[in-house]
């Protein structure tokens, strides 16, 4: 276990005096209609939460946590789930809130929820009853905010959730292929809360309840606001331009000047006078009351290098112990982003997860099936945060790098509650995990390093010597959980960080012996150093060592178990040769992947910055700094995805064409070392048929009308010319003689 952290909050999450409405007590479900409010005896809601998800009263759903958290503070909280956004009417169904609207797109970004990585429309939505698509608008945060303002103009609107959190600054938008303004500016909301929102949400709610205008609440951590100038008392660091070397003064020569000769005259002692002792306050730390001025929205939109520079700064200002505020100009105003909130302590985490959740969907949905709930209803979240720092992932920017773990007792109590209260429980816990399965209770062993570190990852390129890799707390938790009465099996479905696991083989033995249901998910993401260095993922040496240990312990337990690796195609830094080598590795190890994923440029991720700018924000940025190869265009992205499914005959023509272009024709054939088979006679005939349907050779003598014809129209014209002029026309009767 690590020492006591130096990163401490000003006050405990549950130390605020309860609001007067606490006398109503907790609601069975947070109300979604006026009828439910009447049954609770409420005349109005203090806070109304608007969400793009169905309301499931479960701690895996953000709105349930926020709602129950505010309820525990004494506020009356209503929920408007998946409202009809075509008018303001649905946003008025609970009446006017006394304090504010809280708006979120849901547990997922609404654009990622609606579109695939190839920008194709999805036809389902796991967070909607019966998996129906189209129940939330594109850019739901913007739409919901506009309707809330239209319904009650004088009620403050506070944004939250993953969609708003990752769009708090100017950001690249993959779906429109442009840089967009901060969502706070576009939505005209009053405040944005990024990351896990318990601390800022509770503080802002209480301050509003005490009569403080939201325009004067400007100093809350984990919030972003619109300002006209920097907050008073803060000093700034200008980073609107790239870092340049300053002038270095020459070192003075110690013997450069002749000193005067010594004078041996006696010196009379000076009269000593008493001096007052001045007690100075403790010196301010260099990051306190300091902000960084980022390049403006207008600058980053027009200059990709400045965009990468701004992204690099933002990712280095995420440690709550030493992060500075950020300030970015948008037109004649600024987006002011306060430092991240202090992580929750174990006691606070326990209190949050002990709130009176029903752990089922709201009764208004009847027997409708909600796939996202079905997936997690028998799972337990044991921690938050991730210190892996993978470039393509935004969990670190949202939940933080410091792991926030629950106590063993809290987790055991939740397992018992699932066993005793959740309908349909069969004795199997589907997951004990979080963003990563094996980071429970792992933190920095040095409090001072934890407070001041600005590394993007604690495990890349190597595991930091300060990082605790002792998995004993996790092993003890697993053992205690599976010994509970009525529990048949504890499965681990969250991804295992194998480079940390190999540091403690006891964990791998425990996992392989008791907690794998035949297959275990891990994510090497790639095999080649080029893309792995951009992803900030370990090399295949760690994977090979983990596989060796996993296979050994599985054999000792008498079990036949397999690893299921996940890979990403078309990630920045991935060349065609890298994907061919990955495909050969897959074939060598007899992997045939069914589901493959092209890289999806989500807002705020470092990989998205690489995708848009072609620069590497993991190192110092400059106009001549290292560039990154980016596989763009539908054809190249299709090829990379096809190479992951080298065994699919539908992909063979595309792969053959690419191998021939790369000079790797020797990989086509029936030999063992070949990637795809040679084309069959029928395939070659079909290719010739397709080649015939092309444009004829043109010369300067070809008529202009013929030059402009497509193959289809040329074929039609030639067939028309071959027919008689009056073919198919009705024959006219001969004219009468003498007429």
Curated annotation (Swiss-Prot):
Keywords: 4Fe-4S, Iron, Iron-sulfur, Metal-binding, S-adenosyl-L-methionine. Residues 729-739 have a biased composition (Basic residues). It comes from the Bacteria. GO terms for molecular function: 4 iron, 4 sulfur cluster binding; catalytic activity; iron ion binding. This is UPF0313 protein YgiQ. Residues 685-739 are annotated as: Disordered. SUPFAM superfamilies: Radical SAM enzymes. Binds 1 [4Fe-4S] cluster. The cluster is coordinated with 3 cysteines and an exchangeable S-adenosyl-L-methionine. The gene is ygiQ. Its cofactor is [4Fe-4S] cluster. Residues 372-650 form the Radical SAM core domain. SMART domains: Elp3 (SM00729). Belongs to the UPF0313 family. Residues 704-724 have a biased composition (Polar residues). [4Fe-4S] cluster binds at residues 386, 390, 393. Pfam families: DUF3362, Radical_SAM, Radical_SAM_N. Gene3D superfamilies: tm_1862 like domain.
